[in-house]
């Protein structure tokens, strides 16, 4: 099961839990990028570039002017951009699938909460790096024509997802959920 399962196949508890795997896998793949940690510190005085050096593409970070969303093709940001959007679309698919699943309500609630947490987490990274972002919470295929929402609207969506997730996520310490989202 290397990708998101067909929505028709999300009928049992095992199907729903298995469908979480590609969402977490994409997040793991995104975090393997060595630049992710650095992009979160650029724009501060922690890391700067030297004008005479070979890091010209990184100068946008010194001026903190990369948040206009126009630099998503910058090599240092492209991996994060693509990876977090994949997490969002996988999470959207799972949230849609949970709605029609015949699995027990308790597991549906947990899986929905995890998917919403992962979507919120991804938006949190994207809005900090790119500013105004499209909010795509319906559908699983981007059109490329989604309008950008303001940073405030993005944070409201993040908060909404996190509040819904908080109700559904399990308490920390469950051995069945090691490495997965929980309430802490």
Language-model features: where?
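Short linear capping/connector segments at secondary-structure termini
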Residues: 2-5, 137-143
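Conserved, well-structured interaction surfaces
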Residues: 17, 25-31, 55-130, 144-153, ...
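Amphipathic alpha-helical protein-interaction segments enriched in hydrophobic
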Residues: 178-184
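Acidic, glycine-rich segments characteristic of secretory precursors and extracytoplasmic regions
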Residues: 1-44, 48-52, 152
